[in-house]
Amino acid sequence: MTEYAILCEKASAAKNFASALGGTSGEFEGHSYKIVHSHGHLMAFVDPKEQVPDDKAAQYRSWKLEHLPWQVADFSWEKQPIMAKNPRTGRKKSTKSDLTEIKKNVKDCDALVIATDVDPSGEGELLAWEIINAIKWRKPVKRLYFADEEARSIQAGFRDIKPISSQQSDGDYLKSDARSKWDFLSMQLTRIATTVTKQAGYPVKVVREGRLKSLMVRHVHEQATLVKNYKRKAFYEVKFQDNAKHVFARQFKDDETAAKWRHAVKADAATEMAQYHNSAITNVKTARRHSAPPKLLDLSNLASILAPKGYNAKEVLSTYQKMYEAKIVSYPRTDDSKISMAQFYQLLPLVPAIARVVNVDQSLLTHRKPRFTHVTTGSVDHGANRPGEKVPPTLAGLSKYGKSGPAIYSVVAKNYLAMLGEDYQFDHVTAELADYPSFKTAFNVPVALNYKLIFDSSRQISDVDETQGEAQGQLGQTAAPFIFEGANKKPVRPTMKWLMNYLQHYNIGTGATRVSTLSQITAGTTALMKERRGALSLTDTGTISAILTEGTIISSTNATKRLMTLMDQVGSFKLHPDELLTTATQTVTHDLPIMVKNADKLKASLGEPEKLVKHYPKKAKTGGQTSTGKEVSFNQVWGGHRFTTQEVADLLAGKEVQFQIKTKRGKPMAVHGKLAQQTYRGHKFWGFKPADDVFQRRTKSRRKAR
């Protein structure tokens, strides 16, 4: 008998575990083990109609609003193996075979050890217990915790494998299971949104609503509306300027105070300016100040920095995950904002090599002691995002993990190295006018850039202009009055930086959760948003979603934050999972009538429904009389080939024509055929029809090649 069956989340993790422990099976420090792995989630909830008693199935199948909200007590929460389509072959495959394989491999083991990712959301725990239940495992279950897939971390976790007395005593599982059930129940909101939209006459496929996605969409819509409705209101204000271009102005504590000195008419400002004369500058004070490097970036910050370079959320998420599995960077789904003391000293010897790869001057890396703004003496789960212990030889080679690979490593590495740079030093200068002391100036003069020469993440992730307040040169001797033309502040356009900063400010989700959600709602035919080089805009469906969720719980920032707090309480045994699920029913009950009412606003924002219908360009037609005297019309282009006048005449005469086209892969392909009447979805039409052997011959040649 083998003592431990170690269950990893995916094949890449199993490979790293095998490397750390000495093989896919064997013995490590007196304990025999065998490594098995999943391929992510293998189980999923069955459809709502299959979750409930037979006499209620029709009700739960229906999308009619009269059947909402659902009764949580009706649900069995049954799961089944996932049936997924292979994107390359198009074939569907059930995960049942994976479960069978795992069950066969662990049957002779004494205990099953959960070694899935230690995710802050508890997703790894949920994934593992789904498998444990599916294979009907009845022996002991244990947990191996690890910070990352480095050998040191895996070995430390193996030495400290912890028992789990029962599924219900695993807080991470309870949290993730309750969250997945809440999200399943939120499907009702998608049904509401889709139904009321179709009833209003808009031809949507589905309007997706959900825990974080609805908040994101609504917030982007609100900001885009502010931008759209912005009207510039100029004002004129008297200020002073010296000959070194330093501006002296009154300091206002609020807009009401500022309004007293900001004139709507330029002539009024000129009248005020006539009261002033040139004034000497006095009370000049200079203070030497310094600022430490900004904190380490989370995944949402990283993605928002890379978005303007053309790397979308899905690309960054996918590539970072592959680089983590190769030990190039740290664990992506971390909730930590600092690293541990041990992690700091583990990377310290690698600093010269990391600096060489990203072309950072090593003479700047002189701060070799832990900064307690970045390093904690306490414990961390994974530690903040940072370079891994495997240093790549070159940046260019990282493109094998994804096109954003070099850019990801460059930002992550430089951000980490900035911590080892000295503080930025600058002189903070203040002064005022001798004759008009209420007119003051303040600016910073850089003395030593230090860490800013390595990487300044605060400037990289900011969605506002931070150059204001920095100046060069000495103050002048005197300053003269002038009329400054300003305007009410223009709202910031919605960008990925702006959105991620907002969510981070309210501590909603981990960095990886934010990026993952954005990736989901910007992909596919039912996308709610579009992201182009960091700029965010809504699709028609996204606009519909935003309008429908105005005033709802599902799109509320405070409600979303509260919901995530409740989920954490489930994980720490402070809240029963059933109590969390009642909030899903409360949300649907509250939001349903609001969304129905909001549907009346769609026309005002979107126009008449037909304007949303996608109009495809008309295809070029040709035609004439066939040999039987029938007048026909057919497409002049087939497979990218445009029929010549002679080919059209031959087709009408019933003759066969031959020509070359290119396949989707760009390979040449010979085609021959005739004009024929055909049927597609019950509709009869005339068009070119390739001979039966055209595609048959191609299939045979492919088989031979194989």
Regions found by a protein language model. Give the residues of each.
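C-terminal accessory/connector segments of nucleic-acid motor ATPases
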Residues: 230-247, 278-319, 325-328
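Basic, low-complexity terminal or inter-domain segments flanking catalytic cores
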Residues: 2-5, 24, 88-91, 95, ...
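Short, conserved phosphate-binding/catalytic loop or strand-edge motifs used
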Residues: 149-153, 298-300, 319-329, 333, ...
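Intrinsically disordered, low-complexity regulatory segments
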Residues: 1-188, 486-490
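Metal- or metallocofactor-binding catalytic centers and their adjacent structured scaffolds
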Residues: 167, 258-295
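C-terminal helical "lid" subdomain and adjoining coupling/linker elements of P-loop NTPases
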Residues: 201-208, 219-262
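OB-fold/S1-family RNA-binding modules
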Residues: 48, 108-113, 247-264, 628-634, ...
